[in-house]
């Protein structure tokens, strides 16, 4: 932090320093690095230049209404800007064990070197637990860690706080499978831009899930039926498989490769990522609709409401619950469902 003038040091948000991962000058407008710089400069002024500032990778977090968004290191956009080859993984986990109440969605994206697995960056979005996951990833990046080190992190585990396989461990396993070639992946952008004459989109979710939304033109063969219906799939096309978040897609990929299919990829992050990324941005105005049946204020009638708690259920659990409810209710009745 000593400048070209021997008695002048530079600290704070306005100074440039080499990024630890790229070596290129950059600015980091965060209070934590600025305070550390102040301590380092004070020590160096008193004791001589004994401590070198290693730089900051830009770990940040923000509260967006009831959600938390956090980031550390280099995101895909910045890696493209610097021309650094990278791979990425997207995983959807839960803030803690799904069987324990109030488990909430947590999405993690990693960027890493496609050969060595060196971690470049991480992004996390969720309602609970995003902060501690991004802190763990940031620590590993600062230490030059890899995606394989994510698997080795020893975290405090009990069902209210995490899962036996923590979300960052899951992200590490998925990234490792991508690097090793055990799971070739396609991104949502590749799916959206694919040549439909040479590709087949295979949805291995249940029929009920498919009916709630699917990638246009995809063929629905549920995972449980796949082995018996492999003959329906073309071997002269590239097959992009997807499920809700990626796990069933991975299992389907293994089934197909075991039967000799070679041009098969799994959608990274599943349909949840694709649907979110391609959804149109809408400005909606809240309205109140009445039809004379469901409005107790106007009719004075008490409407029968079926309440469903689907919290903690893994896909396709919530979809199956609501399907059963729809089949059982009568005309004018209402469903209230809570799911994570």
Protein language model features and the residues they cover:
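A short, polar/charged loop-to-alpha-helix boundary motif
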Residues: 128-147
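Short, glycine/acidic-enriched loop or turn micro-motifs at the edges of active sites
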Residues: 16, 206, 225, 312
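Domain-level signature for proteins that mediate thiol-based redox and metal-cofactor handling
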Residues: 295-340
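Rossmann-fold NAD(P)-binding glycine/threonine-rich loop
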Residues: 3-5
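Short, surface-exposed connector motifs at secondary-structure boundaries
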Residues: 118, 234-238, 328-335
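Rhodanese-like catalytic fold shared by cysteine-dependent sulfurtransferases
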Residues: 148-159, 163-189, 193-200, 207-240, ...
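A structural signal for the hydrophobic beta-strands that form the central parallel beta-sheet
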Residues: 10-11
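Mid-to-C-terminal Rossmann-like scaffold of FAD/NAD(P)H-dependent oxidoreductases
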Residues: 14-128, 159-163, 167-193, 199
């Amino acid at each position: 932090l000593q400048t070209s003038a021997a008695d002048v040091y530079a600290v704070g948000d306005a100074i440039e320093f080499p990024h630890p991962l790229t070596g290129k000058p950059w600015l980091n407008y965060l209070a934590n690095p600025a305070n550390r710089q102040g301590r380092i400069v004070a020590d160096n002024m008193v004791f001589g230049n004994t401590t070198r500032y290693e730089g900051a990778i830009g770990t940040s977090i923000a509260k967006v209404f009831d959600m938390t968004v956090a980031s550390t290191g280099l995101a895909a956009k910045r890696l493209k800007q610097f021309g650094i080859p990278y791979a990425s993984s997207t995983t959807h986990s839960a803030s803690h064990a799904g069987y324990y109440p109030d488990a909430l969605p947590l999405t993690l994206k990693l960027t890493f070197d496609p050969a060595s697995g060196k971690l470049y960056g991480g992004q996390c979005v969720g309602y609970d637990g995003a902060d501690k996951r991004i802190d763990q990833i940031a620590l590993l990046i600062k230490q030059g860690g890899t995606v394989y080190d994510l698997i080795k992190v020893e975290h405090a585990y009990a069902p209210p706080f995490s899962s036996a396989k923590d979300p960052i461990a899951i992200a590490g396993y998925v990234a490792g499978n991508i690097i090793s070639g055990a799971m070739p992946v396609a991104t949502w952008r590749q799916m959206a831009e694919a040549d439909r004459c040479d590709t087949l989109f295979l949805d291995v979710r249940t029929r009920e899930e498919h009916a709630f939304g699917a990638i246009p033109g995809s063929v629905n063969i549920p995972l449980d039926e796949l082995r018996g219906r492999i003959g329906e799939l073309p071997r002269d096309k590239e097959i992009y498989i997807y499920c809700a978040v990626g796990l069933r897609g991975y299992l389907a990929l293994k089934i197909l490769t075991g039967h000799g299919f070679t041009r098969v990829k799994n959608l990274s992050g599943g349909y949840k990522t694709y649907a979110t990324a391609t959804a149109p941005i809408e400005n909606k105005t809240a309205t109140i609709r009445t039809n004379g049946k469901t409005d107790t204020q106007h009719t004075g009638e008490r409407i029968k409401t079926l309440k469903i708690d689907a919290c903690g259920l893994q896909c396709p659990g919530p979809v199956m619950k609501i399907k059963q409810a729809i089949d059982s209710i009568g005309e004018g009745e209402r469903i209230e469902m809570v799911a994570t």
